[in-house]
């Protein structure tokens, strides 16, 4: 019992005391450990410390005499007790001394369901800089309006071209026009939100930026641009709206094109505000492609180039590549060779075949004797792999369809064959054609990769000139 008490006393009282005193003991016994770099004599070191302490005390007394208070404050104290209306003592309390408020922001509270979360934050929360930029725009806009109001309207000379559209779309007077029901349906006329709540008989304040803060500067900006496009004082033939985009002089686009352009821009702006996904844009693009705008020439040119580029198409891997098993191959896989016992396999084997190669050799050597029997009942004996390696039989009605017999006049076939042999100069193959039990397979030489790449890029580049491009979103 006594021993337990002693242990507890040691653990709770003596040990912390020792640990508190220990660093100082160590320091003062080994003064050369005080700084890691220079070794100072003990008495010199003590003198230095005492001098520093003395100077500090002098400074502290002087500050207290001048009315300064030096005390440590916690973070919360600093945060709560700084009152900017009545600057504290340590700022010097003279009016010309600036007071810098250094407060760390509050750490974020964890989200809770009890409190209202602002999500997402408005751009105006970024505050002054953003509003300042918007104001720059609005001031500029106002200046432009006033200038154009005072300007003497210059006559357009020569008179603009007659509109290419039917007369319904050409009606463009200063009066607000009454629209036929057809054009009223087709026009997208967007009434942007007003400044304040709309009241019935109240004349609206046309140039007000904000009234009772009903909308942000951003909405005001949208409203101004909308008034410039659709309002009463709108520009009739804005610059950049024509076939040669020279402004009102060279003859502008018809109203229908102009309206379409404006509508498209407006919709794009709405899309950007709303945010859209990859999925939406691909839907738009496929709808565009389905509506037959791609010129057929471009598609055919591109197809021609891509089909002749063999390099990236996959070579045959047994049950990995269904396109290869349908025999749309860059390199046609050679049919299995009949081997004699002492002969090395000449063809290069793929993964699965390499695994079974010895077994296959043994089996095929045995099969040479029964070859006639095997050809008789081929369907019963052939495994899946054999069918896949068999170059004939792409369609199951192949045995019913004969090759068309080409008939030449007398001796012409022989002449054709001879000239073909002379042109080929020893055959089309890099490797000699392998004679198998089925048929002779000649692998076409592979195109070197840089040639293939060049050919593909060239094709895509050429065909891109023949396409009428979609609107990119």
UniProtKB/Swiss-Prot annotation:
Basic and acidic residues bias (residue ranges): 168-197, 341-397
Major subcellular site: host cell
Disulfide bonds: none
Compositional bias ranges of the Pro residues kind: 155-165
Annotated compartments: Host mitochondrion
Location of the region described as Disordered in the Swiss-Prot/TrEMBL record: 105-124, 142-201, 232-253, 327-437
Keywords, in A-Z order: Host mitochondrion, Host-virus interaction
Chain's role: Plays an essential role during infection by modulating mitochondrial ultrastructure and thereby increasing bioenergetic potential. Mechanistically, alters cristae architecture by interacting with components of the host mitochondrial contact site and cristae organizing system (MICOS) complex.
Identification of the protein by name: Uncharacterized protein UL13
